[in-house]
């Protein structure tokens, strides 16, 4: 076994091991996949037990989000892991370095390495993205370490301040005479410490500058190396392209050599063929002279056939050569396409390398930004003057670095553009060379075709000459051929006559075989009926036992539920009581219902199923349309993304577009040529088809002539058969007379058996009455009413029969009383047979009622046979029969009641499960235990069923023995009666003549009734056909309307999304512009504030010098003047801000209004155009459907009519041939079959309902588990993201961000939950509808087979009529087919024309859309470049999101594309929300900074005032205290103390 096969075997083995654990054996649950990842891939994954890693793999793996991982998804992750291992192996063994050395030396493994690189390129990209993520995480860790260092420094400063604060307190406690000396010493110490700190900062700054120089030098070296690598790669690419060119040229030369060789061989073959034909012609002339007339004739026929073949095959020969040329052209195009793909892959490799270089540069830039942030932190410890100086130096340095970066970026872009221009020039050169090659190839092809056409013309001229010679030979021997044809026609006629004779014999044998098969089928049906009756009795008993078992199960289930549901128990008990009351009420109502209501319910169910099927189809269509929309949106986004990536090459793209347009023009011309070629070929095919059609018509005419002759003979045969049937009818009438005599004796014996049977049934009924006493009253009332109706009917019949008896007594008054009863019984039986036949046609849908009526009729017949003293027994028997009917009706109702009870039980179980799921998640274990218990009970039930079956079989054997004994007794009695009948035969002969006359009249009346019924059926069938056609038209109209509305809504939605996207882009652009303006204003404001601050400081110094001379009122005036100045300045700023905001809002509203109007106009135009096109398409489809459906409907209607006619004839035959017991047996058999079918269907429905509910519950449990896992995973992801944001942001943003994320999380969870619920609901409805439709189809298939079996006999009798009808239908179909072909050709031309127009319009729209998107993207990029560079966190998040987007996009291309759109939409929404959130945060930050700045200004003003006031006060106290200096020194009013307090307030946490 090869390593590949062994690996595949191991993969499938592992999958099957885990899949067979808990699921259906074909898929993995997420829990099993998690275990598999942790166990099998633990050594490969970086953190195998990390929940983040495993959950991320699970989220990426389950692309269809069904909670299960199938084998395809499992294979995808296995291949990803294998690719990761391959990449890790290369890194560990240092393959990359060795391969780089080999490349410099010209290693021969270079091509193989490129192929591997191309093959594993997506995996390498993903690994690169993961490596970048790890680097970013490491950078975050470094930032955290820096923050911790800063915190430690701040703590040291705080401790130092605390020490100083303690020293100050000690100074205050010391004597006041030493305070000034200690204060001076402390100031000196503080200055020395500051000096040391400045020296240390300078040393650190020098070290950083040296490190920066080293890094810049390294960066320059890296750039040099990268440029060298790029040059080397460019050289390698050029070498590879040259190799490819050489390979292409060699292939083209080789191909030309092959074509020349083929042409040479073909020319030699043609020359050889011409020589052979010339030799054959000479031989034929020689043989003509020597051979006889017959041989010449035969040779002539063969030569004619050859000539026809050559004519026919000359055209395919040309077509074959043409197809060969087309194949060669296709091969050349494929080779060219392959070369272009290879060139494109090389360009993509270079683009990826450039992206890597840019990423490295961005990382270096981030590192420099971090160092700058560290420098800013260090400056916080310096004094204000030093901080100001350092800040200015940093600003200058930042500007210089920004300029340098901008220069480097421009230099890179310039180099990149130069490289791109060179590539573009190379590509243009290649395209020009390609065009030149194509032109050369075209000239060669044209020359070859010209040569070939010349040869073909020569060959055709020679062919024409041969045909002329053949025509001369044909004219010479034409007379002889006519004679030969006459002989052949005579021979054909003889063969046809022989075939007809054989066909008649075969048909006769088939009829005989059919009769034998019918006899066997009747016997089998009788056996099946008996078997079904036995099974029916068994099922009745089983149903009773099942009812008891269900009640026991219900009790146990309620006991178990009481343990877990204390509060819910009361509600469930009330529900159960209500259901029991409802059940009793329904049972009382159902006793009065008949089978008609059941049929109406079935009709309603069918209608509901039809509605559900339509709803499912509509949902399916909507899903398909949604998928198509998502596909369109994906394509549009892909185009936009590609266009954004190529913005910096706008001019080059425009030139490329012009070239592409020219190439497309050429391609369109080529397509037009191909289309014309296809049309020419199609016309040739049409001509061939017309020739074949003419031949078919000729054959059809001959066939019709033969069939006409055959039908005439068949008509003669039918007349003979009709005469024979009349003879047989007479014989049957004779046999019927004899049968009636025998039946009289048989009835007496049957009456005795009936009495015994009734006694046994009475005993069984008594047992049943003991079980069902609670239903007796209601059933008795119903039976009494039925008995009264039955008595009235019997009274009418009795009067009629008494009149008949009186007439018979007048004619046969000399006969004995016994004979009179027999004669009366005979006439009554004949009358009853006629009534039974009519009732059977009328009551096919009410078979239960028919059986009851039949039993009553039998009772009446028995009462007439017996004497009057048995009338009391008859009443008791009627009562017993009523009890039998009652028991049977109850048995019939029992399955329905059981089904309803089971439904209620299932509903209760479902509700209780829902409540348990909401309150007790641990109840899943109980459900599994219940499932095991149900399986155990089912096993016990099957064992009990087998025992009961054995008991029933013993009972049936006992009844069979009794029946045989009675039959023997009846045989003995029959022999005795036959002796008596022989004596009376002479007397009855005269009576039989009169009876025959009555029978004839009876048959005539019966025939009239049949004709009326036939007419009614025809009318009913036509009415149904019209209704069906009308329904079909309405459905089609409704579907068209729905389709049109759906497309209209989709178009509106697409336009709205586009408008929303444009508005969003415009709004983001304006927001960024406003942000930039606000930042500029803030900077100006800061400069203004700085200028004001310096001005105030100078003013304060001047004021301090003049403060001694001024009075106390002057500081107050100055403060008032400063306050007014600040207030006015603040008012001016607020007004300017308000004016800017109003102007911005006004511009935004105007632009939004203009965009809205334009988009509305475009949407209206597009909607009207598409609406017109859709209406036209729908009309065409409707006409096509109607044309296709009309012949089918007509055939279906005729077929149904013939089947119904055959059914009626078959029933009439069976009624005439079979006896009354057979009719009864057939009726009972059908009834039992239907009962059994109903029970089987109900049992199957119950089973399906149980399985469906079980699957739904299991699915609900899985969905809940999946939902919990998703929530847990989302929660962890959000918590981690929140932690990162909290570290990066300041303390004042925490509360606001937390609230915003919680609201966003709630919204997403609600939307996700709603989508999941909607999807699950639709899936369950579809599954249920599919089951119902499958059940309906199976039922229809079974009914159809049953009808087909019954109709076989009648179809064969009417074979001749069908032939005639089929011939008419065939001719109509031929005409319709021709019309459809012509219509299809016309539609094809119209479709081609429309397709070309649509293609051109789509091309124009695409180009306009492309330009608009390019313009918008260009503006967007220009605005993005102006954003603030210090937004590091936003940049990092965007990179992470883009990397995730690319990884998910690559993964989704390998798997199912249907889910990609949803994920991308969520990703875009998240980015949009993130962008808006950041914008709101920044705006809020800006407001906070402004407020903080105002507060700081106010605090500075107050502080300066308080400082001035305290200095004045201190000076006054010093001047006043001349006698007692240092007595009360103002320690807290010094500027040094205020400075310390300010520093402490800044660094205090």
Curated annotation (Swiss-Prot):
Q: Which GO terms describe its biological process?
A: intermediate filament organization; keratinization
Annotated region (S-100-like), positions in chain: 1-91
A GO molecular function annotation here is: transition metal ion binding
Q: Where does Ca(2+) 1 bind?
A: 27, 32
Q: Which residues bind Ca(2+) 2?
A: 62, 64, 66, 73
Please outline how this chain is modified post-translation: Substrate of transglutaminase. Some 200 arginines are probably converted to citrullines by peptidylarginine deimidase.
Keywords from UniProt, A to Z, are: Calcium, Citrullination, Keratinization, Metal-binding, Repeat
Signal as a keyword? Answer: no
- In residue numbers, the region (Disordered) covers 97-125, 157-180, 262-359, 404-448, 782-803, 839-942, 980-1000, 1489-1549
Transport listed as a keyword: no
Locate the transmembrane regions by residue number.
none
Database matches in Pfam families: S_100
Task: List residue spans for each sequence repeat.
Answer: 413-448, 449-476, 477-504, 505-532, 533-560, 561-588, 589-616, 617-644, 645-678, 679-706, 707-742, 743-771, 772-796, 797-832, 938-961, 962-985, 986-1021, 1022-1044, 1045-1067, 1068-1090, 1091-1121, 1122-1144, 1145-1167, 1168-1197, 1198-1227, 1228-1250, 1251-1273, 1274-1296, 1297-1319, 1320-1342, 1343-1368, 1369-1391, 1392-1416, 1417-1439, 1440-1461, 1462-1484, 1485-1507
Positions of the UniProt region annotated as 14 X 28 AA approximate tandem repeats: 413-832
- List, for all copies, the residue spans of the domain called EF-hand: 23-48, 49-84
Task: Please list the residue ranges that the record marks as compositionally biased, kind Low complexity.
Answer: 336-348
Q: Where is this region: 23 X 23 AA approximate tandem repeats?
A: 938-1507
Gene3D superfamilies linked: EF-hand
Q: In which tissues is it expressed?
A: Found in the hard keratinizing tissues such as the inner root sheath (IRS) of hair follicles and medulla, and in the epithelia of the tongue, hoof and rumen.
Q: What PROSITE patterns does this protein's entry cite? A: EF_HAND_1, EF_HAND_2, S100_CABP
- Per the entry's comment, what about the domains? Consists of nine domains. Domain 1 contains two EF-hand calcium-binding domains. Domains 2-4, 6, and 8 are almost entirely alpha-helical, configured as a series of peptide repeats of varying regularity, and are thought to form a single-stranded alpha-helical rod stabilized by ionic interactions. Domain 6 is the most regular and may bind KIF directly by ionic interactions. Domains 5 and 7 are less well organized and may induce folds in the molecule. Domain 9 contains the C-terminus, conserved among different species.
* PANTHER family in the record: TRICHOHYALIN (PTHR34855:SF1)
Subunit structure, per the record? Homodimer.
Q: Which family does it belong to?
A: Belongs to the S100-fused protein family.
Q: What does this protein do?
A: Intermediate filament-associated protein that associates in regular arrays with keratin intermediate filaments (KIF) of the inner root sheath cells of the hair follicle and the granular layer of the epidermis. It later becomes cross-linked to KIF by isodipeptide bonds. It may serve as scaffold protein, together with involucrin, in the organization of the cell envelope or even anchor the cell envelope to the KIF network. It may be involved in its own calcium-dependent postsynthetic processing during terminal differentiation.
The protein's name: Trichohyalin
- Report the source organism: Ovis aries
């Amino acid at each position: 076994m090869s390593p590949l096969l062994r690996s595949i075997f191991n993969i499938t083995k592992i999958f099957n091991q885990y899949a067979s654990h808990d699921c259906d054996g074909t898929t993995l649950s997420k829990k099993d996949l998690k275990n598999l990842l942790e166990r099998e891939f633990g050594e490969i994954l970086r953190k195998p037990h990390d929940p983040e890693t495993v959950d991320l793999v699970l989220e990426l793996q389950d692309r269809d989000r069904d909670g299960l991982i199938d084998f395809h998804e499992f294979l995808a992750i296995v291949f990803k892991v294998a690719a990761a291992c391959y990449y890790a192996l290369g890194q560990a063994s240092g393959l990359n370095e060795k391969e780089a050395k080999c490349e410099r030396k010209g290693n021969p493994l270079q091509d193989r390495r490129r192929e591997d690189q191309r093959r594993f390129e997506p995996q390498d990209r993903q690994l690169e993205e993961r490596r970048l993520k790890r680097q970013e995480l490491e950078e975050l860790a470094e930032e955290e370490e820096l923050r911790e260092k800063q915190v430690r420094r701040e703590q040291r400063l705080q401790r130092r301040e605390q020490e100083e604060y303690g020293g100050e307190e000690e100074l205050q406690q010391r004597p006041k005479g030493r305070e000034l000396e200690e204060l001076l010493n402390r100031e000196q110490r503080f200055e020395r410490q500051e000096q040391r700190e400045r020296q240390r900062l300078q040393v650190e700054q020098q070290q950083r500058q040296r490190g920066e120089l080293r890094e810049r030098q390294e960066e320059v070296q890296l750039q040099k190396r990268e440029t060298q690598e790029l040059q080397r790669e460019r050289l390698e690419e050029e070498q590879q392209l040259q190799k490819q060119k050489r390979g292409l040229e060699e292939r083209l030369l080789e191909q030309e050599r092959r074509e020349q060789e083929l042409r040479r061989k073909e020319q030699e073959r043609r020359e050889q063929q011409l020589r052979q034909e010339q030799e054959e012609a000479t031989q034929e002339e020689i043989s003509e002279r020597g051979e006889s007339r017959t041989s010449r004739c035969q040779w002539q026929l063969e030569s004619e056939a050859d000539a026809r073949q050559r004519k026919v095959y000359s055209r395919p020969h040309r077509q074959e050569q043409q197809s060969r040329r087309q194949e060669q052209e296709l091969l050349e195009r494929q080779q060219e396409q392959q070369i272009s793909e290879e060139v494109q892959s090389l360009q993509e490799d270079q683009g990826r390398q450039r992206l890597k270089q840019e990423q490295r540069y961005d990382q270096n830039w981030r590192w420099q930004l971090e160092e700058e942030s560290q420098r800013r932190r260090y400056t916080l410890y310096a004094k204000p003057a030093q901080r100001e100086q350092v800040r200015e130096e940093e600003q200058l340095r930042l500007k210089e670095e920004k300029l340098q970066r901008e220069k480097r970026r421009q230099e890179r872009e310039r180099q990149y553009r130069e490289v791109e221009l060179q590539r573009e020039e190379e590509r243009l050169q290649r395209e020009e060379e390609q065009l030149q090659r194509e032109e050369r190839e075209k000239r060669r092809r044209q020359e070859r075709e010209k040569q070939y056409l010349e040869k073909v013309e020569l060959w055709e001229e020679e062919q024409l000459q041969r045909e002329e010679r053949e025509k001369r030979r044909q004219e010479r021997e034409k007379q002889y051929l006519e004679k030969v044809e006459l002989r052949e026609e005579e021979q054909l006629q003889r063969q046809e006559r022989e075939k007809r004779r054989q066909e008649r014999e075969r048909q006769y044998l088939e009829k005989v075989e059919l009769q034998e098969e019918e006899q066997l089928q009747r016997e089998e049906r009788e056996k099946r009926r008996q078997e079904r009756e036995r099974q029916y009795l068994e099922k009745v008993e089983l149903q009773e036992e099942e009812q008891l078992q269900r009640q026991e199960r219900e009790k146990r289930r309620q006991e178990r539920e009481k343990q877990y549901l204390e509060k819910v128990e009361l509600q469930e008990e009330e529900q159960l009581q209500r259901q029991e009351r409802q059940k009793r009420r329904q049972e009382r109502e159902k006793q009065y219902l008949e089978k008609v209501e059941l049929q109406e319910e079935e009709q309603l169910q069918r209608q509901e199923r039809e509605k559900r099927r339509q709803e499912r189809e509509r949902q399916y269509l909507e899903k398909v349309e949604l998928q198509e929309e998502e596909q369109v949106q994906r394509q549009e986004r892909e185009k936009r993304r590609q266009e954004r990536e190529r913005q910096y090459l706008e001019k080059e793209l425009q030139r490329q577009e012009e070239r592409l347009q020219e190439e497309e023009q050429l391609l369109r011309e080529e397509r037009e040529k191909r289309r014309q070629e296809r049309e020419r070929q199609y016309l040739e095919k049409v001509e061939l088809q017309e020739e074949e059609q003419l031949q078919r018509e000729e054959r059809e005419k001959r066939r019709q002539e033969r069939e006409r002759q055959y039908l005439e003979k068949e008509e003669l045969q039918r007349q003979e058969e009709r005469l024979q049937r009349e003879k047989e009818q007479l014989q049957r009438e004779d046999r019927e007379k004899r049968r009636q005599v025998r039946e009289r004796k048989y009835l007496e014996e049957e009456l005795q058996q009936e009495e015994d049977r009734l006694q046994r049934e009475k005993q069984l009924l008594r047992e049943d009455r003991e079980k069902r006493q609670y239903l007796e009253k209601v059933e008795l009332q119903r039976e009494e009413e039925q008995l009264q109706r039955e008595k009235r009917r019997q009274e009418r019949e009795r009067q009629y029969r008494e009149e008949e008896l009186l007439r018979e007594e007048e004619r046969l008054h000399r006969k004995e009383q016994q004979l009179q009863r027999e004669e009366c019984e005979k006439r009554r039986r004949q009358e009853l047979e006629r009534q039974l036949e009519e009732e059977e046609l009328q009551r096919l849908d009410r078979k239960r009622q028919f059986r009851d009526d039949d039993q009553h009729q039998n009772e009446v017949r028995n009462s007439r046979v017996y004497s009057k003293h048995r009338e009391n027994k008859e009443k008791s028997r009627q009562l017993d029969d009523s009890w039998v009917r009652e028991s049977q009706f109850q048995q019939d109702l029992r399955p329905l009641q059981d089904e309803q009870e089971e439904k209620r039980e299932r509903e209760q179980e479902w509700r209780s499960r829902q409540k348990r799921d909401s309150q007790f998640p641990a109840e899943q274990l109980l459900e599994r235990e219940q499932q095991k218990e149900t399986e155990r009970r089912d096993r016990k039930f099957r064992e009990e069923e087998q025992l009961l079956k054995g008991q029933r079989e013993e009972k049936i054997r006992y009844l069979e023995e009794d029946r045989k004994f009675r039959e023997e007794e009846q045989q003995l009695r029959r022999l005795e009666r036959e002796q008596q009948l022989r004596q009376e035969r002479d007397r009855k002969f005269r009576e039989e003549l009169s009876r025959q006359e009555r029978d004839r009249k009876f048959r005539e009346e019966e025939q009239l009734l049949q004709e009326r019924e036939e007419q009614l059926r025809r009318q009913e069938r036509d009415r149904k056909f019209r209704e069906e056609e009308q329904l079909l038209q309405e459905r089609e109209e409704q579907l068209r309307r729905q389709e049109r509305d759906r497309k209209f809504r989709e178009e509106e939605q697409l336009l709205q999304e586009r408008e929303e996207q444009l508005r969003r882009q415009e709004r983001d652009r304006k927001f960024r512009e406003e942000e930039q303006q606000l930042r500029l204003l803030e900077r100006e404001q800061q400069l203004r504030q700085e200028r004001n601050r310096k001005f105030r400081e100078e003013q304060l110094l001047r004021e301090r010098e003049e403060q001694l001379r001024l009075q106390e009122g002057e500081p107050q005036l100055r403060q008032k003047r400063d306050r007014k100045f600040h207030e006015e300045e603040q008012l001016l700023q607020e007004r300017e801000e308000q004016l800017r905001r109003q102007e911005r809002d006004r511009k935004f509203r105007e632009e939004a209004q203009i965009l809205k109007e334009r988009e509305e106009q475009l949407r209206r135009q597009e909607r009207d155009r598409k609406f017109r096109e859709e209406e036209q398409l729908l009309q065409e489809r409707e006409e096509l459907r109607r044309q296709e459906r009309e012949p089918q409907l007509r055939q279906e209607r005729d077929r149904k009519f013939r089947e119904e006619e055959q059914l009626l004839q078959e029933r009439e035959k069976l009624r005439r041939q079979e006896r009354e017991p057979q009719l009864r047996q057939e009726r009972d058999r059908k009834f039992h079959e239907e009962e059994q079918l109903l029970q089987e269907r109900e049992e199957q429905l119950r089973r399906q309902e149980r399985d469906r509910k079980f699957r739904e519950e299991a699915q609900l449990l899985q969905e809940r588990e999946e939902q919990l896992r998703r929530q847990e995973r989302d929660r962890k992801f959000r918590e981690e993201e929140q932690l990162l944001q909290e570290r990066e942001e300041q303390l004042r943003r925490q509360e606001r961000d937390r609230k915003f994320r919680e609201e966003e999380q709630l919204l997403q969870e609600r939307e996700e939950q709603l989508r999941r619920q909607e999807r699950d609901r639709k899936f369950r409805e579809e599954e249920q509808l599919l089951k119902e439709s499958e059940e309906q189809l199976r039922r229809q298939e079974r009914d159809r087979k049953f009808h087909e079996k019954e109709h076989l006999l009648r179809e064969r009798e009417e074979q001749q009529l069908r032939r005639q009808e089929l011939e008419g239908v065939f001719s109509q179909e031929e005409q319709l087919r021709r019309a459809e072909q012509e219509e299809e050709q016309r539609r094809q031309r119209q479709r081609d024309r429309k397709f070309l127009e649509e293609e051109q319009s789509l091309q124009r729209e695409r180009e306009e859309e492309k330009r608009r998107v390019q313009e918008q993207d260009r503006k967007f990029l220009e605005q993005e470049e102006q954003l603030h560079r210090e937004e590091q966190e936003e940049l990092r998040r965007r990179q992470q999101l883009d990397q995730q987007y690319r990884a998910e996009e690559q993964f989704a291309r390998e798997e199912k594309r249907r889910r990609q759109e949803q994920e991308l939409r969520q990703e875009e929404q998240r980015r949009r929300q993130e962008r808006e959130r950041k914008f709101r945060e920044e705006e809020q930050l800006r407001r906070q900074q402004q407020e903080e700045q105002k507060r700081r200004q106010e605090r500075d003003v107050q502080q300066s005032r308080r400082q001035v006031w305290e200095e004045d006060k201190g000076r006054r106290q010093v001047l006043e205290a001349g006698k007692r200096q240092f007595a009360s020194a103002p320690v807290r009013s010094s500027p040094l103390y205020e400075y310390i307090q300010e520093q402490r307030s800044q660094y205090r946490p």
